[in-house]
Amino acid sequence: QIFDSWGGMLDSEYEEFSLMYINELAENIPGNIPVILFTRGKKIDSIIESTNIKCFNLDISDNIDHHIDKSIVIQGNFDPSKFHSDADKLEQLATQIFEKYKNKNNYIFNLGSGLTPDIDPEKVGIFLEKLSSLSS
């Protein structure tokens, strides 16, 4: 996975100062190794057209449903602040995500950004256990 954590800070300069090097890096990775690109704060529409990368990890600012039926793989987009919810709400969220994307072969569940220190690991566990029980 290529993490371009600050790519969203660039506007018109993104292609010249970031994407050009990402493409060069991706082209030098053997073809049997999948490449996933995460660019925080950048909508991936323009990136899709400018790269051969076929898997994108979305941050929480992008709309996953806008991309789900394209010929790319989508990962991420779950807002980790939702882990502040109570256990019942977390189980509901896991069920909603599972039901919405269970028939999509191009979706990988993942977070849209990192966990902050104030998130209770037990809450993450509740969510993941529910999601896992639904998918098995």
Where are these regions (language model features)?
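Active-site loop segments of alpha/beta catalytic cores
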Residues: 1-136
